[in-house]
Amino acid sequence: MANDFLFTSESVSEGHPDKVADQISDAILDAIFKQDPKSRVAAETLCNTGLVVLAGEITTNAHVDYIQVARDTLKRIGYDNTEYGIDYKGCAVLVAYDKQSNDIAQGVDHASDDHLNTGAGDQGLMFGYACNETPELMPAPIYYAHRLVERQAQLRKDGRLPFLRPDAKSQITMHYVDGKPHSIDTVVLSSQHSPEMSNGLTMKPAFIEAVMEDIIKPVCPKEWLTADTKYLINPTGRFVVGGPQGDCGLTGRKIIVDTYGGACPHGGGAFSGKDPSKVDRSAAYAARYVAKNIVAAGLARQCQIQVAYAIGVAKPMNVTVYTEGTGVIPDDKIAELVHELFDLRPKGIIQMLDLLRPIYEKTAAYGHFGREEPEFTWERTDKAQALRAAAGL
Protein backbone atom coordinates (compact mmCIF):
# COMPACT_ATOMS: atom_id res chain seq x y z
CA MET A 1 0.00 0.00 0.00
CA ALA A 2 1.24 3.53 -0.78
CA ASN A 3 2.50 5.64 2.12
CA ASP A 4 -0.10 8.39 1.52
CA PHE A 5 -3.66 7.12 1.22
CA LEU A 6 -7.24 7.21 2.52
CA PHE A 7 -8.67 4.26 4.46
CA THR A 8 -12.23 3.81 5.73
CA SER A 9 -13.84 1.68 8.44
CA GLU A 10 -17.42 1.56 9.70
CA SER A 11 -19.24 0.54 12.85
CA VAL A 12 -22.87 0.12 13.89
CA SER A 13 -24.67 0.66 17.18
CA GLU A 14 -26.13 -1.94 19.51
CA GLY A 15 -29.54 -1.10 18.05
CA HIS A 16 -28.57 -2.01 14.49
CA PRO A 17 -30.62 -5.10 13.51
CA ASP A 18 -27.60 -7.33 12.83
CA LYS A 19 -26.07 -6.30 16.16
CA VAL A 20 -29.37 -6.96 17.93
CA ALA A 21 -29.16 -10.50 16.56
CA ASP A 22 -25.52 -10.85 17.65
CA GLN A 23 -26.32 -9.67 21.17
CA ILE A 24 -29.27 -12.03 21.56
CA SER A 25 -27.10 -14.93 20.37
CA ASP A 26 -24.36 -14.09 22.86
CA ALA A 27 -26.87 -13.46 25.66
CA ILE A 28 -28.17 -16.99 25.03
CA LEU A 29 -24.59 -18.32 25.19
CA ASP A 30 -23.93 -16.49 28.46
CA ALA A 31 -27.16 -17.72 30.03
CA ILE A 32 -26.19 -21.29 29.19
CA PHE A 33 -22.58 -20.90 30.39
CA LYS A 34 -23.79 -19.56 33.76
CA GLN A 35 -25.21 -23.03 34.39
CA ASP A 36 -23.10 -25.36 32.23
CA PRO A 37 -19.74 -24.10 30.91
CA LYS A 38 -19.15 -27.39 29.07
CA SER A 39 -22.09 -26.76 26.75
CA ARG A 40 -21.79 -26.78 22.99
CA VAL A 41 -23.57 -23.74 21.58
CA ALA A 42 -24.16 -22.42 18.07
CA ALA A 43 -27.00 -19.94 18.60
CA GLU A 44 -28.30 -18.07 15.56
CA THR A 45 -30.85 -15.24 15.68
CA LEU A 46 -33.11 -13.54 13.15
CA CYS A 47 -35.01 -10.40 14.07
CA ASN A 48 -37.59 -8.58 11.99
CA THR A 49 -40.61 -6.36 12.63
CA GLY A 50 -42.19 -7.71 15.84
CA LEU A 51 -40.41 -11.07 15.52
CA VAL A 52 -37.34 -12.88 16.87
CA VAL A 53 -36.40 -16.37 15.67
CA LEU A 54 -33.88 -18.43 17.65
CA ALA A 55 -32.33 -21.41 15.85
CA GLY A 56 -29.11 -23.40 15.78
CA GLU A 57 -27.54 -26.28 17.67
CA ILE A 58 -27.23 -26.47 21.46
CA THR A 59 -26.12 -29.41 23.61
CA THR A 60 -26.35 -28.54 27.31
CA ASN A 61 -27.54 -29.57 30.74
CA ALA A 62 -28.62 -26.00 31.43
CA HIS A 63 -32.28 -25.03 31.69
CA VAL A 64 -32.64 -21.59 30.14
CA ASP A 65 -35.73 -19.54 29.34
CA TYR A 66 -34.56 -18.58 25.87
CA ILE A 67 -37.60 -16.42 25.18
CA GLN A 68 -37.00 -14.33 28.29
CA VAL A 69 -33.31 -13.92 27.45
CA ALA A 70 -34.26 -12.55 24.03
CA ARG A 71 -36.80 -10.15 25.55
CA ASP A 72 -34.34 -8.96 28.21
CA THR A 73 -31.74 -8.23 25.54
CA LEU A 74 -34.18 -6.17 23.47
CA LYS A 75 -35.13 -4.24 26.61
CA ARG A 76 -31.50 -3.49 27.51
CA ILE A 77 -30.81 -2.20 24.00
CA GLY A 78 -33.86 0.07 24.16
CA TYR A 79 -36.50 -1.61 22.01
CA ASP A 80 -39.31 -0.92 24.46
CA ASN A 81 -41.90 0.80 22.29
CA THR A 82 -44.03 -0.49 19.43
CA GLU A 83 -43.18 2.72 17.55
CA TYR A 84 -39.66 1.32 17.12
CA GLY A 85 -40.95 -1.68 15.15
CA ILE A 86 -40.14 -4.23 17.83
CA ASP A 87 -41.07 -4.11 21.51
CA TYR A 88 -39.59 -6.56 24.01
CA LYS A 89 -42.92 -6.84 25.81
CA GLY A 90 -45.06 -7.93 22.89
CA CYS A 91 -42.87 -9.31 20.11
CA ALA A 92 -43.14 -12.94 19.04
CA VAL A 93 -40.15 -15.16 19.88
CA LEU A 94 -39.86 -18.52 18.13
CA VAL A 95 -37.40 -21.16 19.40
CA ALA A 96 -36.04 -23.89 17.11
CA TYR A 97 -32.82 -25.29 18.57
CA ASP A 98 -31.41 -28.73 17.73
CA LYS A 99 -28.53 -30.58 19.42
CA GLN A 100 -24.99 -30.58 18.09
CA SER A 101 -24.39 -33.25 15.47
CA ASN A 102 -22.87 -36.44 16.90
CA ASP A 103 -20.56 -36.53 13.88
CA ILE A 104 -19.07 -33.20 14.94
CA ALA A 105 -19.07 -34.03 18.65
CA GLN A 106 -16.99 -37.18 18.19
CA GLY A 107 -14.17 -35.17 16.67
CA VAL A 108 -14.32 -32.45 19.29
CA ASP A 109 -14.96 -34.45 22.44
CA HIS A 110 -12.96 -37.63 21.93
CA ALA A 111 -9.97 -36.71 19.82
CA SER A 112 -7.59 -37.80 22.59
CA ASP A 113 -7.49 -38.89 26.20
CA ASP A 114 -5.24 -35.87 26.70
CA HIS A 115 -7.77 -33.04 26.98
CA LEU A 116 -5.28 -30.48 25.66
CA ASN A 117 -5.30 -32.40 22.39
CA THR A 118 -9.05 -32.07 21.95
CA GLY A 119 -9.70 -31.33 18.30
CA ALA A 120 -10.90 -28.13 16.71
CA GLY A 121 -14.68 -27.85 16.28
CA ASP A 122 -14.35 -27.08 12.57
CA GLN A 123 -11.83 -26.36 9.88
CA GLY A 124 -11.06 -22.78 8.99
CA LEU A 125 -8.62 -19.90 8.97
CA MET A 126 -8.52 -16.97 11.36
CA PHE A 127 -6.60 -13.70 11.55
CA GLY A 128 -5.42 -11.48 14.35
CA TYR A 129 -4.01 -7.99 14.03
CA ALA A 130 -2.47 -5.19 16.05
CA CYS A 131 -0.76 -1.90 15.22
CA ASN A 132 0.52 1.14 17.08
CA GLU A 133 -1.98 3.67 15.69
CA THR A 134 -3.86 3.93 19.01
CA PRO A 135 -2.97 3.17 22.66
CA GLU A 136 -5.25 0.13 22.40
CA LEU A 137 -3.07 -1.10 19.49
CA MET A 138 -6.00 -0.99 17.07
CA PRO A 139 -6.34 0.63 13.64
CA ALA A 140 -7.56 4.19 14.17
CA PRO A 141 -10.53 4.17 11.74
CA ILE A 142 -12.38 1.22 13.31
CA TYR A 143 -11.49 2.28 16.85
CA TYR A 144 -13.04 5.74 16.50
CA ALA A 145 -15.97 4.47 14.42
CA HIS A 146 -16.84 2.24 17.40
CA ARG A 147 -16.51 5.08 19.86
CA LEU A 148 -18.93 7.26 17.84
CA VAL A 149 -21.82 4.80 17.95
CA GLU A 150 -20.98 3.83 21.52
CA ARG A 151 -21.37 7.48 22.54
CA GLN A 152 -24.59 7.73 20.54
CA ALA A 153 -26.01 4.91 22.67
CA GLN A 154 -24.70 6.45 25.90
CA LEU A 155 -26.34 9.82 25.23
CA ARG A 156 -29.56 8.13 24.14
CA LYS A 157 -29.76 5.98 27.25
CA ASP A 158 -28.82 8.61 29.84
CA GLY A 159 -31.40 11.03 28.42
CA ARG A 160 -29.04 13.80 27.31
CA LEU A 161 -30.20 13.39 23.69
CA PRO A 162 -33.66 11.87 24.18
CA PHE A 163 -34.59 12.21 20.50
CA LEU A 164 -32.07 9.53 19.50
CA ARG A 165 -33.33 6.01 18.83
CA PRO A 166 -31.40 2.73 18.97
CA ASP A 167 -30.22 2.23 15.38
CA ALA A 168 -27.10 4.06 14.18
CA LYS A 169 -24.11 3.69 11.87
CA SER A 170 -20.75 5.45 11.75
CA GLN A 171 -17.87 5.62 9.31
CA ILE A 172 -14.40 7.17 9.53
CA THR A 173 -12.20 7.89 6.51
CA MET A 174 -8.64 8.46 7.69
CA HIS A 175 -5.90 10.25 5.76
CA TYR A 176 -2.56 8.50 6.19
CA VAL A 177 0.77 10.23 5.52
CA ASP A 178 3.97 8.19 5.53
CA GLY A 179 1.84 5.22 6.51
CA LYS A 180 0.62 6.85 9.75
CA PRO A 181 -2.72 8.46 10.66
CA HIS A 182 -2.49 12.16 9.84
CA SER A 183 -6.06 13.52 9.86
CA ILE A 184 -9.69 12.51 9.50
CA ASP A 185 -10.91 13.12 5.97
CA THR A 186 -14.60 12.30 6.52
CA VAL A 187 -16.90 11.45 9.41
CA VAL A 188 -20.25 9.83 8.62
CA LEU A 189 -22.82 9.37 11.38
CA SER A 190 -26.40 8.29 10.72
CA SER A 191 -28.68 8.00 13.73
CA GLN A 192 -32.27 6.93 14.00
CA HIS A 193 -34.34 9.65 15.63
CA SER A 194 -37.82 10.63 16.75
CA PRO A 195 -40.04 12.16 14.04
CA GLU A 196 -39.96 15.74 15.32
CA MET A 197 -36.23 16.09 14.53
CA SER A 198 -36.85 16.34 10.79
CA ASN A 199 -38.76 18.70 8.52
CA GLY A 200 -40.09 16.30 5.94
CA LEU A 201 -36.96 14.57 4.63
CA THR A 202 -34.55 17.21 5.96
CA MET A 203 -32.93 17.12 9.39
CA LYS A 204 -33.49 20.09 11.70
CA PRO A 205 -30.39 22.18 12.50
CA ALA A 206 -30.76 21.30 16.20
CA PHE A 207 -30.22 17.63 15.39
CA ILE A 208 -27.14 18.31 13.26
CA GLU A 209 -25.67 20.57 15.94
CA ALA A 210 -26.31 18.10 18.77
CA VAL A 211 -24.70 15.20 16.90
CA MET A 212 -21.72 17.35 15.97
CA GLU A 213 -21.12 18.94 19.37
CA ASP A 214 -22.12 16.07 21.68
CA ILE A 215 -21.02 12.99 19.73
CA ILE A 216 -18.47 13.70 17.00
CA LYS A 217 -16.29 16.38 18.62
CA PRO A 218 -15.93 14.67 22.02
CA VAL A 219 -14.91 11.38 20.35
CA CYS A 220 -12.61 12.32 17.48
CA PRO A 221 -9.11 13.54 18.44
CA LYS A 222 -8.96 17.32 17.97
CA GLU A 223 -5.61 17.15 16.23
CA TRP A 224 -7.13 14.94 13.50
CA LEU A 225 -10.06 17.27 12.78
CA THR A 226 -8.99 19.92 10.28
CA ALA A 227 -10.59 22.66 8.22
CA ASP A 228 -10.82 20.13 5.41
CA THR A 229 -12.58 17.40 7.42
CA LYS A 230 -16.01 16.63 5.97
CA TYR A 231 -19.00 15.79 8.21
CA LEU A 232 -21.97 13.83 6.88
CA ILE A 233 -24.68 13.66 9.54
CA ASN A 234 -27.76 11.69 8.45
CA PRO A 235 -26.80 12.45 4.82
CA THR A 236 -30.01 10.95 3.43
CA GLY A 237 -32.07 13.00 5.87
CA ARG A 238 -34.99 11.53 7.84
CA PHE A 239 -34.17 8.23 9.64
CA VAL A 240 -37.20 7.32 11.75
CA VAL A 241 -37.81 3.74 10.61
CA GLY A 242 -34.83 1.64 11.66
CA GLY A 243 -33.72 -1.37 13.65
CA PRO A 244 -35.34 -4.72 12.88
CA GLN A 245 -38.28 -2.89 11.28
CA GLY A 246 -36.01 -1.21 8.76
CA ASP A 247 -33.92 -4.29 7.97
CA CYS A 248 -34.03 -7.95 8.95
CA GLY A 249 -31.18 -8.64 11.38
CA LEU A 250 -29.10 -11.82 11.35
CA THR A 251 -26.31 -13.11 13.56
CA GLY A 252 -22.86 -12.93 12.01
CA ARG A 253 -23.39 -10.29 9.34
CA LYS A 254 -21.05 -7.67 10.79
CA ILE A 255 -17.78 -9.59 10.88
CA ILE A 256 -15.62 -6.68 9.68
CA VAL A 257 -17.20 -4.35 12.24
CA ASP A 258 -16.46 -7.02 14.86
CA THR A 259 -12.76 -7.20 13.98
CA TYR A 260 -10.43 -4.64 12.38
CA GLY A 261 -12.58 -2.65 9.98
CA GLY A 262 -10.94 -4.16 6.92
CA ALA A 263 -7.37 -3.36 8.00
CA CYS A 264 -6.43 -7.03 7.70
CA PRO A 265 -7.94 -10.13 6.04
CA HIS A 266 -10.82 -12.06 7.60
CA GLY A 267 -11.24 -15.82 7.53
CA GLY A 268 -15.02 -15.52 7.16
CA GLY A 269 -16.20 -17.07 10.42
CA ALA A 270 -18.47 -15.04 12.70
CA PHE A 271 -18.16 -14.94 16.49
CA SER A 272 -21.47 -14.38 18.24
CA GLY A 273 -23.49 -17.29 19.58
CA LYS A 274 -20.53 -19.69 19.39
CA ASP A 275 -18.94 -21.38 22.39
CA PRO A 276 -15.11 -21.34 22.42
CA SER A 277 -14.74 -24.89 21.09
CA LYS A 278 -15.51 -23.15 17.79
CA VAL A 279 -12.13 -21.87 16.60
CA ASP A 280 -13.90 -19.27 14.45
CA ARG A 281 -14.18 -17.39 17.71
CA SER A 282 -11.53 -18.64 20.13
CA ALA A 283 -8.65 -18.79 17.64
CA ALA A 284 -9.47 -15.31 16.33
CA TYR A 285 -9.30 -14.06 19.92
CA ALA A 286 -6.00 -15.89 20.41
CA ALA A 287 -4.58 -14.46 17.18
CA ARG A 288 -5.41 -10.95 18.41
CA TYR A 289 -3.71 -11.79 21.73
CA VAL A 290 -0.57 -12.93 19.94
CA ALA A 291 -0.47 -9.96 17.56
CA LYS A 292 -1.10 -7.42 20.33
CA ASN A 293 1.68 -8.83 22.50
CA ILE A 294 4.11 -8.76 19.57
CA VAL A 295 3.40 -5.07 18.97
CA ALA A 296 3.38 -4.27 22.70
CA ALA A 297 6.78 -5.98 22.99
CA GLY A 298 8.20 -3.67 20.35
CA LEU A 299 8.94 -6.52 17.95
CA ALA A 300 6.94 -4.75 15.21
CA ARG A 301 4.83 -1.63 14.63
CA GLN A 302 2.08 -3.75 13.10
CA CYS A 303 1.50 -7.47 13.06
CA GLN A 304 -0.88 -9.85 11.31
CA ILE A 305 -1.27 -13.45 12.47
CA GLN A 306 -2.92 -16.22 10.47
CA VAL A 307 -3.85 -19.54 12.07
CA ALA A 308 -5.70 -22.44 10.46
CA TYR A 309 -7.27 -25.65 11.76
CA ALA A 310 -8.72 -28.96 10.61
CA ILE A 311 -11.81 -30.36 12.32
CA GLY A 312 -10.94 -32.87 15.02
CA VAL A 313 -7.24 -31.94 14.98
CA ALA A 314 -5.76 -29.94 17.86
CA LYS A 315 -2.54 -28.59 16.38
CA PRO A 316 -2.95 -25.64 14.00
CA MET A 317 -2.18 -26.30 10.36
CA ASN A 318 -0.09 -23.13 10.37
CA VAL A 319 0.77 -20.08 12.46
CA THR A 320 2.03 -17.35 10.13
CA VAL A 321 3.38 -13.96 11.16
CA TYR A 322 3.43 -10.96 8.82
CA THR A 323 4.73 -7.61 10.06
CA GLU A 324 4.69 -5.76 6.71
CA GLY A 325 8.35 -4.86 7.03
CA THR A 326 7.97 -3.24 10.46
CA GLY A 327 9.54 -6.08 12.47
CA VAL A 328 12.83 -5.61 14.29
CA ILE A 329 13.63 -9.30 13.78
CA PRO A 330 12.55 -11.50 10.83
CA ASP A 331 8.93 -12.68 10.72
CA ASP A 332 9.95 -16.35 10.79
CA LYS A 333 11.89 -15.73 14.01
CA ILE A 334 8.84 -14.07 15.56
CA ALA A 335 6.79 -17.11 14.51
CA GLU A 336 9.25 -19.36 16.35
CA LEU A 337 8.73 -17.29 19.51
CA VAL A 338 4.96 -17.59 19.10
CA HIS A 339 5.26 -21.39 18.99
CA GLU A 340 7.37 -21.30 22.16
CA LEU A 341 5.19 -18.96 24.22
CA PHE A 342 1.58 -19.50 23.10
CA ASP A 343 -0.47 -22.72 23.12
CA LEU A 344 -2.76 -22.37 20.10
CA ARG A 345 -4.47 -25.73 20.40
CA PRO A 346 -8.19 -25.13 21.00
CA LYS A 347 -8.11 -26.29 24.62
CA GLY A 348 -4.86 -24.44 25.16
CA ILE A 349 -6.53 -21.25 23.95
CA ILE A 350 -9.54 -21.81 26.21
CA GLN A 351 -7.24 -22.23 29.23
CA MET A 352 -4.87 -19.41 28.26
CA LEU A 353 -7.70 -16.88 27.85
CA ASP A 354 -10.13 -18.35 30.42
CA LEU A 355 -12.94 -18.55 27.88
CA LEU A 356 -15.42 -20.89 29.61
CA ARG A 357 -17.19 -17.97 31.28
CA PRO A 358 -20.37 -15.96 30.58
CA ILE A 359 -18.48 -12.98 29.13
CA TYR A 360 -19.73 -12.82 25.57
CA GLU A 361 -22.77 -10.52 25.40
CA LYS A 362 -20.51 -7.55 26.11
CA THR A 363 -18.37 -8.41 23.06
CA ALA A 364 -21.33 -8.38 20.67
CA ALA A 365 -21.45 -4.60 20.12
CA TYR A 366 -18.69 -2.01 19.63
CA GLY A 367 -16.00 -4.49 18.66
CA HIS A 368 -14.47 -7.65 20.06
CA PHE A 369 -11.01 -6.05 20.11
CA GLY A 370 -9.38 -2.88 21.41
CA ARG A 371 -11.36 -2.71 24.65
CA GLU A 372 -10.02 -2.63 28.19
CA GLU A 373 -12.75 -4.43 30.16
CA PRO A 374 -11.27 -7.19 32.39
CA GLU A 375 -13.36 -9.88 30.67
CA PHE A 376 -11.46 -9.23 27.43
CA THR A 377 -8.49 -11.42 28.40
CA TRP A 378 -7.22 -11.49 24.81
CA GLU A 379 -6.44 -7.78 25.18
CA ARG A 380 -3.83 -8.35 27.89
CA THR A 381 -0.18 -7.73 27.05
CA ASP A 382 1.21 -10.03 29.73
CA LYS A 383 3.39 -11.93 27.24
CA ALA A 384 5.17 -8.84 25.93
CA GLN A 385 8.10 -8.97 28.33
CA ALA A 386 8.67 -12.68 27.68
CA LEU A 387 8.63 -12.01 23.94
CA ARG A 388 11.20 -9.24 24.31
CA ALA A 389 13.45 -11.43 26.40
CA ALA A 390 13.20 -14.36 24.01
CA ALA A 391 13.97 -12.02 21.11
CA GLY A 392 17.05 -10.71 22.91
CA LEU A 393 15.76 -7.14 23.16
From Swiss-Prot:
Positions that bind K(+): E44
Protein name: S-adenosylmethionine synthase
Gene Ontology CC: cytoplasm
GO biological process, one term: S-adenosylmethionine biosynthetic process
Disulfide pattern: none
Signal sequence residues: none
Species name: Albidiferax ferrireducens (strain ATCC BAA-621 / DSM 15236 / T118) (Rhodoferax ferrireducens)
Catalytic EC class: transferase
TM regions (residue ranges): none
Note describing how the cofactor binds: Binds 2 divalent ions per subunit. Binds 1 potassium ion per subunit.
Positions with a binding annotation for ATP: H16, D167, A168, K169, R238, F239, D247, R253, K254, A270, K274
Keyword set, alphabetical order: ATP-binding, Cytoplasm, Magnesium, Metal-binding, Nucleotide-binding, One-carbon metabolism, Potassium, Transferase
Binding site for L-methionine: E57, Q100, D247, K278
Binding site for Mg(2+): D18
Pathway note: Amino-acid biosynthesis; S-adenosyl-L-methionine biosynthesis; S-adenosyl-L-methionine from L-methionine: step 1/1
NCBIfam families given in the database record: metK
Top-level taxon: Bacteria
